[in-house]
Structure formats: C-alpha cells, structure tokens
A protein has these predicted regions:
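Glycine-rich, flexible N-terminal cofactor/catalytic loop recognition
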Residues: 1-60
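A contiguous loop/helix-start segment that scaffolds small-molecule binding in enzyme catalytic cores
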Residues: 4, 158, 165-281
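Loop/turn-to-beta-strand initiation segments
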Residues: 5-7, 77-81, 157-158
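Short active-site oxyanion
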Residues: 27-34, 106-110, 158-159
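General beta-strand structural signal in soluble alpha/beta enzymes
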Residues: 36, 111-114, 161, 187
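Conserved helicase motor
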Residues: 57-64, 138-141
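A glycine-rich beta-strand to alpha-helix segment
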Residues: 75-120, 166-170
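Class I SAM-dependent methyltransferase SAM-binding "motif I" and its flanking Rossmann-like core
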Residues: 97-155
Length: 281
C-alpha cells in the first residue's frame, strides 16, 4: 500500500473464500480501519486470513451518522477499507455517501477489484454482454414490481436483477408476464459455492422450475434477462393481458386462464393472479 491516505473500495468473496485477491488481503491488513456492512459477517473472512484490523459498522441505517467520524479518521492520515458482506461494495450495497464525501473532501478513492455476483453471473450466462444494465433488486410489492418490469420490457440490453429467496418465485412469474414467457433468461444462485447453479431457459420455464424446486432457496439470486429485439414493439405482457381480459368477458376464470396460458405461454399462476384482479364485476 502506498503512503497516500485513501479510502479503499475492496471487493470480497461472494462465497468461496479463496477468491479474495492477495492485494485485497494486504490492504485489509494494512489500513487503519475497515468499514464493514456487517462486522459479524466480515469477521469470519478476516479471521480466515489472520487479519486483525479494527472494524466499524457501516450500513444503510447508519451511513450518514458515521460519515463525520470516518472522514475525520481519513483526515488524520489513516486509510480506510470499505467492504460489504460479499462482493463489490456499492453494487446494491451501502457506501455511496462515504465515497461521495471522500471525493468532495479531496481524499483519494481507490478501487480494489474482485468478486461481483452480477458480473460473475453475466460472464457465465451465455447472453449478450456487450450492452447490459444492472437493475438491482425489484420492488417488494407486486404492483410496483410489475410496473418496474413493464417499464424495462422493451430495453434491448441484457438486464441483470438481484432477488431475495422469499420473493424469487413471484418475481420470476412477474418477469414472465411482463417480458414474455418465451424471453431467454438465466437464473444463477449459490455462485462459487458447493451448490452453485446457473440455469438458462425461457422465463416461463424458469418461473415454473423455481416454483417446483425441491432444494431450499437460500441466498440471493441473480436473474439475467435477454434484451428485447431492437424491432420489438409493445411488451408481450400487454398482449397477454388483453387476451386474458377478452376471455374473462366470456368465460369462467379457470377456463379463461387455461386458454390464455396456452395462447401466450405465460404461466397459469401469473394469469390467475391477473384474472382475480381484473375480472369484471
């Protein structure tokens, strides 16, 4: 590490502890303080590498409160390493306010590259990677999430999302509805771990696979969706909803859903939710 005081943005393993780079390990051992998203989680990594550098918690709930103390630490000539629980800091993790404040204070901000779940999944997905957009976590609420996907359905770039295990089933069903059940996609989970899975299929198939999966849904998922063809018009989901609405006007819900699923390829459970919300009185 140079003698220049700096805020180091250090990427840490997303599962396999061997993925910490020698440079990252050295910097974590040499800085005066480590700002960690969760000190309990990061302690396991530091203990594994025999690193005894003091830590302080920096997460979304205390980042603004911690800024004065951390900036003062840097002004005193003591470098800080920022780490998240796993992967590259600031990629759907805290740290933005600290990095911005360091720049404004004239303090060097130095990236120490390494693991990132989004990029690892993209590299193994087999989807176009010359243009892509990282969209982070979709909204938790169904209506907002559907709108979130709908607004991105015509984007020609490969889209990368993170999702939690308790929302992955609903999110994939909503993606299939808004992007179209036949849109190419990839689900990646447990990356670099023993039960690593990278599965490529149509969105409708992935939604059904996850819903039927017998293995526990643990850890965060990365979902990658192929971009819409440049010539694409309105999202396929809009056609599916129109077809469903026409059928609901003439048929019972169960029959309308069955026919709409056969016509559009959208999963029945997704169409059934729409039917309950939209069936005319």
């Amino acid at each position: 590490m140079s003698n220049t005081v700096a805020l180091y943005i250090v990427a840490t393993p997303i599962g396999n502890l061997e993925d910490l780079s020698p440079r990252a390990a050295r910097i974590l051992a040499e800085v005066g303080l480590i700002a960690a998203e969760d000190t309990r989680t990061s302690r396991k990594l530091l203990t594994h590498y025999g690193i005894a550098t003091p830590m302080t918690a920096l997460h979304e709930h205390n980042e603004r409160e911690q800024l004065p103390k951390l900036l003062e630490h840097l002004r005193q000539g003591k470098s800080i390493a920022l780490i998240s629980d796993a992967g590259t800091p600031l990629v759907s993790d805290p740290g933005f306010h600290l990095v911005r404040a360091a720049h404004e204070a004239g303090i060097a901000v130095v990236p120490v590259p390494g693991p990132c779940a989004a990029i690892a999944a993209l590299s193994a997905a087999g989807l176009p990677s010359d243009r892509f957009a990282f969209e982070g976590f979709p909204p938790a609420k169904t209506v907002a999430r559907r709108r979130f996907f709908r607004e991105r359905a015509a984007d020609p770039r490969t889209l990368i999302f993170y999702e939690s295990p308790h929302r992955i089933v609903d999110s994939l069903a909503d993606m299939a509805a808004e992007f179209g059940a036949v849109r190419e996609a990839v689900v990646a989970r447990e990356l670099t771990k023993m039960f690593e899975t990278v599965r490529a299929a149509a969105l409708g198939e992935l939604a059904d696979w996850i819903a039927r999966a017998e293995t526990p849904r643990q850890g965060e998922f990365v979902v990658l969706v192929r971009g819409a063809p440049e010539r694409a018009g309105a999202p396929a989901a809009a056609d599916a909803e129109r077809i469903l609405q026409l059928l609901l006007a003439e048929l019972p819900v169960s029959r309308a859903v069955e026919l709409a699923a056969r016509i559009t390829g959208v999963p029945k459970n997704t169409l059934y939710k729409q039917a309950l919300a939209r069936k005319p009185d």
